[in-house]
């Protein structure tokens, strides 16, 4: 697996809309190890990370995580292991100008057998289960992180709000998150979870739309002697 370690440094004076800071090039996968954001403005800035999944929607970004504040002359280090595939984009939205952002990342060949992958999507279904991720035939998925954000404008209350793992062979399921999800709040699941071929991660939220990002590894399922 060819690896190239790189960084980027950029500034922006754009306020009120997301600005693309990094796009994954063709034939590559990009994995961030850390991002630093410095506020050069005299006022406190509120920022929001945006992601674009080119395979899902080439024009609309999703909000990744909650917004955060940085006081004047201070920096914030973000250690999220964000993954971008070919054509995917990382952006930032700020309400103040004079913002400086840098990031460290590794570029990998996307043709490798073990692939680092990313899905971001906007879900417009409410009160019904939606497939967020499914392990394809002949492959195993190792899910590293799932973030779901309520962007409906309304608090989603009650135990009908649920994330669950569905096992393909018997169609049995196990909920791993359930309960209220207030407007502009997130559910952040970081426990490693393995999906065998056909297994699914599903969500049901009582309000819509909501934003979902998932980072995972996908690898061929090896044949095991005696199995």
Language model features by range: what are they?
Residues 24-26, 76, 83, 130, ...:
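Low-complexity, intrinsically disordered tandem-repeat tracts enriched in small residues
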Residues 1-30, 34, 38-40, 55, ...:
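C-terminal interaction-tip segments
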Residues 55-87, 170-200:
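Intrinsically disordered, low-complexity Pro/Gly/Ser/Thr-rich segments with frequent PxxP/GP/PP motifs
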Residues 18, 22, 47, 54, ...:
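Intrinsically disordered, low-complexity repeat tracts enriched in Pro/Ser/Thr
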Residues 30, 44, 85-87, 141-143, ...:
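Short connector loops at helix/strand junctions that flank enzyme active sites
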Residues 42-66, 153-177:
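Short, surface-exposed beta-strand/strand-loop-strand elements in extracellular ectodomains
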Residues 44, 60, 100, 106, ...:
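Extracytoplasmic low-complexity repetitive segments enriched in small/polar residues
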């Amino acid at each position: 697996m060819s690896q190239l370690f790189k960084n980027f440094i950029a500034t922006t004076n754009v306020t009120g809309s997301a600005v693309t800071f990094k796009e994954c090039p063709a034939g590559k996968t990009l994995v961030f190890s850390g991002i630093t954001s410095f506020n050069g403005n005299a006022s406190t800035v509120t920022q929001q990370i945006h992601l674009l999944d080119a395979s899902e929607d080439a024009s609309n970004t999703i909000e990744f995580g909650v917004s955060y504040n940085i006081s004047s002359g201070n920096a914030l280090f973000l250690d999220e292991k964000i993954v971008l595939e070919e054509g995917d984009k990382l952006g930032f939205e700020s309400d103040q100008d004079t913002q400086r952002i840098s990031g460290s990342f590794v570029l990998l060949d996307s043709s490798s057998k073990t692939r680092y992958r990313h899905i971001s999507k906007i879900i417009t279904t409410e009160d019904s289960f939606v497939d967020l991720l499914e392990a394809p035939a002949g492959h195993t998925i190792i899910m590293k992180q799932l973030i779901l954000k309520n962007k409906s404008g309304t608090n989603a209350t009650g135990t009908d709000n649920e994330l669950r793992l569905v096992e393909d062979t018997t169609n049995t399921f196990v909920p791993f998150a359930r309960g209220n999800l207030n407007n502009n709040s997130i559910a952040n699941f970081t426990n490693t979870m393995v999906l065998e071929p056909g297994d699914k991660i599903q969500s049901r939220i009582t309000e819509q739309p909501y934003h979902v990002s998932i980072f995972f590894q996908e690898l061929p399922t090896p044949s095991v002697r005696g199995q």
